[in-house]
Amino acid sequence: MRFECVSRTHVGLRRKINEDSIFVDSERGLWAVADGMGGHDAGEMASAMVTDALRCLPVSADLDETATNAVEALRQVNRDLIELARSGESESGTIGTTVVGLAIADGSFRCFWMGDSRAYLVREGEISRVSRDHSLVQDLVDAGMLEPEEAETHENANLITRAVGAARSFEVDIVKGDVRPGDHFLLASDGLTRVMRDHELVAELDGGSLAEAADDMIETVLSRGAPDNVSLVITKVL
């Protein structure tokens, strides 16, 4: 399969360090975004450890094998981050990172994630979330205790319930689906998705060049104050 892909990352306007990391390997059909946490450069290190681990995955044409290998690689990073936190590398006592990854081959995809970095699919002008946030506000929405439109501005919107490095208990969600020519996948950190709404994202992705769409998204976030690092990967199936 052939793909067109662009990626962008920006420190934002309020942070001194960019703790996000992105991974792009369109030849292998593998992409990821990770959003680190932990203070100073600990979050930057955590997200880089995740993308480095994915970069080192063995090449496989089998999507399920790729997903399994990715989970095992993330499991090892989880162990390593816990040990680093114990050694005093984090001012908060935890070194962690979200991750959202996408693998595509032979007309199918696998998406895997921990945390609130998101994967979207835009198909024929319609946008859908491939991933489900591992967050307190998402749990409240699912329980009918919070309206979806209130989630992004909720006082606990930044509290995630899963992350690589957060706990020895470790669970990665994986979903699968089909892909079609013209499909657009967007992987993004919450620095984008808390600032831009879904209908704005689909408007950017529905036509026009990928580079222009990516640049416009970054510019929109910056124009709205960019309170966090922002990272995105856009992949179009050709």
What are these model-derived regions, one by one?
Residues 1-238:
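PP2C/PPM-type serine/threonine phosphatase catalytic domain
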